[in-house]
Amino acid sequence: MQDKILKAQRRVYLSTLYIGKTEHELISTVRSALQNNPDLHVSFLTDSLRGTRETPDPSSASLLAPLIAEFGPRRVEVRMYHTPNLTGLRKKYIPKRINEGWGLQHMKLYGCDDEIIMSGANLSSDYFTNRQDRYHLFRSKELTDYFARIHDGIAKLSFDIQPSNAEGAGGYSMTWPSSNPAPSPLDSPSKYRESAAKHMSHLLTPANSPPTASSSSTTTIYPVLSFVPLLKTSTELPALTKILQSLATAPLHPSTWTFTAGYFNMTPSFRRLLLATRPASGTVLTAHPHANGFFGSKGVSGMLPAAYTHLAKTFL
């Protein structure tokens, strides 16, 4: 990824839950790319709750803000999405580590010019050094353009980060731009949802891909997305449902499938659909409890690994 960032000439966009507060090597790579390529524009999109959790101590926001100070907001953009589900007294009193359960920006899209890495990994040391995760590299201008529009669409519905020297600010300020197509989710959650739905709905249906010359390729890409709670519908649920239903019918029956998940919290409907396929063989790959990021943590979160293990046993 660092090599692709350094070679990028026009654009880099990075959508992730958060960037580790000690990822100075990644920031140094982005800085070098901006210095070497004067036409390069870099856009970061993270989650607000997770990206500012440690404030006023170092956080994703404080790590990224100096890039804006150095290269200016026209070349470096840092946006942080905030769920409209967490406002008022709920936001004030729910502990920070728990409040993320009310909604997050969870896309992992790492685009450089006309290539994109679609991943499940955040940009932090644990994921770089101690996690097994998916990294799919696509060399496709059409696909990279499409997800750039998704990234930009959510960025325009997010808070803007700027550097700040104010005492206790943690090195950054977070404001809601007047140019955003929706009011702040903290000021008017219902109007935010309504405006956000209008802004994002057209992006769920990409334009038809241009016809291509016949080839031996057997790979077809179907982008599926879930923008809950911004939209009441998603393309993720119907697409996965259709695929699983198809596996239970001829000529795909009996089929072979592999189900992978870091956290085994399969919904009842997906569980029924998977079991209904009566596969020739089925493989479930999930994390061992000791490999779970919540293993050994204090409070309710420390109970999650055992809960996922229980769900896996129930499935078997």
Per-range role (PLM):
Residues 1-2, 6, 21-253, 263, ...:
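HKD-type phospholipase D/PLD-like phosphodiesterase module
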Residues 9:
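A short acidic, Gly/Pro-enriched loop at the edge of an enzyme's catalytic core
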Residues 16-18, 260-263:
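Structural motif
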Residues 265, 278-285:
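Classical protein tyrosine phosphatase
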Residues 268-271, 284-285, 293-296:
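Extended hydrophobic-aromatic, low-complexity segments
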Residues 272-277:
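Short, solvent-exposed amphipathic alpha-helical segments in soluble enzyme
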